[in-house]
């Protein structure tokens, strides 16, 4: 499976929602590295959505790392990326990746993480609706 091999090549952290202690440890480690300038990709849905170009609810807790690190949040809209993994084909597949306007700490510092999650979700959802050609 391609994604599994890609994840082996990069340092990635998987949250085990059933193990709170391990999750807190990962949050602390990633926050420390983010404060030091390392960039991370975080999937705030907590799991993969199998519906074409639709999103699940974002988990507010996934934004705790950015708030603790006072880091900018760059929403990214993935359109048709499911085709790469779900079509079981080696044919050329077109997908879209849209990097949206960063949300800086000063803009979200007084917001609750659930509100940040909704803001980011809504921005990505709007981009998908505007650009989804399917």
Predicted regions and their residues:
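Non-catalytic C-terminal accessory region of glycerolipid acyltransferases
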Residues: 24-134
């Amino acid at each position: 499976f391609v994604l599994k091999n890609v994840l082996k090549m990069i340092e990635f952290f998987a949250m085990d929602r059933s193990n709170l202690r391990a999750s807190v440890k990962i949050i602390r480690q990633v926050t420390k590295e983010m404060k030091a300038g390392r960039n991370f990709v975080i999937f705030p849905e907590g799991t993969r959505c199998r519906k074409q170009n639709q999103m699940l609810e974002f988990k507010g807790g996934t934004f705790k790392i950015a708030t603790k690190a006072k880091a900018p949040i760059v929403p990214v809209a993935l359109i048709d990326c499911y085709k790469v993994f779900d079509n079981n084909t080696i044919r050329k597949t077109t997908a879209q990746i849209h990097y949206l306007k960063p949300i800086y700490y000063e803009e979200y510092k007084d917001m609750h993480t659930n509100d940040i999650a909704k803001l980011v979700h809504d921005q990505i959802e709007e981009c998908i609706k505007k650009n989804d050609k399917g």
